[in-house]
Amino acid sequence: MKIEQTLSIIKPNIISNNFIGNIINRLEQAKLYIIASKMIKLSWKEAVSFYIEHKNKSFFSDLINFMISHPIIVQILEGENAIKRNREIMGNTNPKIALAGTLRSDFSNDIIKNGVHGSDSEESADREIKFFFKKDRIFSRI
């Protein structure tokens, strides 16, 4: 199996509902190790820059307004097939159709306020990790 790193974001609704520990516990139980983590409040400019690929989609402004509404936790997860495994743990982007037992099914009920974000490919993970973390702030387990 391949050891990978992926970006994970715990979104504002999880923070405001005090479910942070629940999310981290599930990730740790899945043997996804947190190798960098910080709580931040995104500016409008940062949120637009991070989600630029969605700029022409109908939900873009709702997503940006949500992501700047409260702090978020950004973290780097490391483990075997971390990208795929994190996405499986998160569940479908739409919590209403996410499988029971996934993070989105258990902790959210709205497609915009869906609780968590995870990189969807190695390229995305690399870009997203660099967006939030300097190399000297990442402490790999390998």
From Swiss-Prot:
InterPro entries in the record: NDK-like_dom (IPR034907), NDK-like_dom_sf (IPR036850), Nucleoside_diP_kinase (IPR001564), Nucleoside_diP_kinase_AS (IPR023005)
Molecular functions (GO terms): ATP binding; metal ion binding; nucleoside diphosphate kinase activity
Binding-site residues for ATP, renumbered to this chain: 11, 59, 87, 93, 104, 114
Catalytic reaction list: a 2'-deoxyribonucleoside 5'-diphosphate + ATP = a 2'-deoxyribonucleoside 5'-triphosphate + ADP; a ribonucleoside 5'-diphosphate + ATP = a ribonucleoside 5'-triphosphate + ADP
Keywords attached to this entry: ATP-binding, Cytoplasm, Kinase, Magnesium, Metal-binding, Nucleotide metabolism, Nucleotide-binding, Phosphoprotein, Transferase
SUPFAM superfamilies (UniProt xref): Nucleoside diphosphate kinase, NDK
Primary location recorded for the protein, binned into one broad class: cytoplasm
EC numbers: 2.7.4.6
GO cellular component, as recorded: cytoplasm
Record's subcellular location: Cytoplasm
GO biological process assignments: CTP biosynthetic process; GTP biosynthetic process; UTP biosynthetic process
Location of the active site: 117 (pros-phosphohistidine intermediate)
One Pfam family matching this protein: NDK
Xref: SMART domains: NDK
Cofactor(s) needed by this chain: Mg(2+)
Function: Major role in the synthesis of nucleoside triphosphates other than ATP. The ATP gamma phosphate is transferred to the NDP beta phosphate via a ping-pong mechanism, using a phosphorylated active-site intermediate.
Subunit and partners: Homotetramer.
Family in the record: Belongs to the NDK family.
Protein name as catalogued: Nucleoside diphosphate kinase
Organism from which the protein derives: Wigglesworthia glossinidia brevipalpis
